[in-house]
């Protein structure tokens, strides 16, 4: 496609999405590839330049696990959620805030944008409560310092985005007593999207989307509605770490976000392809057919 055709194709989408908020969650597995990360940063800066307000939420699971391994600590997961004792919480805080968040903000600046790093503790952005024990095979398992979102206070996001900044959020929350809690980044992204009344929630991951057959990357479900989610879980199509990712998208759509997308960040400039071209990639979750 010629360059001018690309621009003409993008025009109606730019018009449709102008001045709207897009919450974009980037997974830790994607951030380990520097070239992919650079493409992601370029995409969100382009969105900002054309009048769209991107709000970034990042994970960091692989880097947290790698740091734990170097420190001789084993990572444990239950239903895709990290079991978090106090030592694990401190490691997560160090990796998420000190490493990943700082790097993303730095890269945004390198490419001509204005990033601002935030955790859920800033301005009481993410207020959470401790997640109750989970029933696993008839046994209650305490996840430790793992939180579930109780409240999002989006004022700090609206102020910074309105002044030309791209907010970059780490999923470390605060409870009513001032304690830190580790919250699943997908859950945070979904809750932030609802609180901001975002036009879209976009989850950038390292798979093609929701696969019809989990073992066949060539067969991707292009679209489904929230009402189909439980059936897909029961059939084993959505499982493991994909469950909280897809569930966050489903809950966001149920609570007012127009559309949620799970797209493959390994594709160069995946966000632009999804938002500003007719092609579309990955899986869309929506009540709109």
UniProtKB/Swiss-Prot annotation:
Coiled-coil ranges from the UniProt annotation: none
Known function: Catalyzes the ATP-dependent phosphorylation of N-acetyl-L-glutamate.
GO cellular component terms, A-Z: cytoplasm
Domain of life per record: Archaea
Taxonomic placement: Archaea, Methanobacteriati, Methanobacteriota, Stenosarchaea group, Methanomicrobia
InterPro entries: AceGlu_kinase-like_sf, AcgluKinase_fam, ArgB, Asp/Glu/Uridylate_kinase, Glu/AcGlu_kinase, NAGK-C
Site (Transition state stabilizer): 25, 245
Organism: Methanothrix thermoacetophila (strain DSM 6194 / JCM 14653 / NBRC 101360 / PT) (Methanosaeta thermophila)
Places the protein is found: Cytoplasm
Listed pathway(s): Amino-acid biosynthesis; L-arginine biosynthesis; N(2)-acetyl-L-ornithine from L-glutamate: step 2/4
GO MF annotation, one: ATP binding
Coarse class of the protein's main subcellular location: cytoplasm
Keywords, alphabetical: Amino-acid biosynthesis, Arginine biosynthesis, ATP-binding, Cytoplasm, Kinase, Nucleotide-binding, Transferase
Chain's gene name: argB
This protein's name: Acetylglutamate kinase
Annotated positions binding substrate: 60-61, 82, 182
